[in-house]
Swiss-Prot record:
Its main location: cytoplasm. Keywords: Cytoplasm, Hydrolase, Nuclease, Ribosome biogenesis. The keyword Nuclease applies. It comes from the Bacteria. Pfam families: RuvX (PF03652). It is found in: Cytoplasm. Its EC number is 3.1.-.-. GO terms for cellular component: cytoplasm. Could be a nuclease involved in processing of the 5'-end of pre-16S rRNA. It is an enzyme of class 3 (hydrolase). This is Putative pre-16S rRNA nuclease. GO terms for molecular function: nuclease activity. One of its GO terms (biological process) is rRNA 5'-end processing.
Length: 138
């Protein structure tokens, strides 16, 4: 069973993939999107879901620190419905508070340049979201 992990931004969609055993998450790519125009990179997601025979999607669900759902969380809820309808696979909304910040700290600690960090931060956040979900299962 393969699971896809996603980190939704306004301009990019970070993508991670579980191994077949469901133990580890690996970053796949960052898809350029345009949330304002409703372009969520669905054609590329379709390819990934078909190529890897995806059984489930874990989508980062950003909540405010007090647990309430703000505008970004609402965007994730809307996107989750689009994914479920389009691909007919279950979508799990996973609390992603601070994952992007944690990913950035890891990249800074690894001395990754600001330019390179910008390219991989969403993919790294998707890995952290998916790995958190996988760890909760095992």
């Amino acid at each position: 069973m393969r699971i896809l992990g996603l980190d939704l931004g306004t301009k990019t969609l970070g993508v991670a993939l579980s191994d077949e055993m469901g133990w580890t998450a690996q970053g796949i790519e960052t898809i350029k999107i345009n949330e304002a125009e409703g372009d969520y990179g669905l054609s590329r997601l379709s390819e990934l879901i078909k190529d890897y025979t995806i059984d489930k999607i874990v989508l980062g669900f950003p909540k405010n620190m007090n647990g309430t759902v703000g505008p970004r969380g609402e965007a994730s809820q809307t996107f989750a419905k689009v994914l479920e309808t389009t691909y007919n696979v279950p979508v799990v909304l996973w609390d992603e508070r601070l994952t992007t910040m944690a990913a950035e700290k890891m990249l800074i600690a690894a001395d990754v340049s600001r330019q390179k960090r910008k390219k991989v931060i969403d993919k790294m956040a998707a890995v952290m979201i998916l790995q958190g979900y996988l760890d909760s299962l095992n």
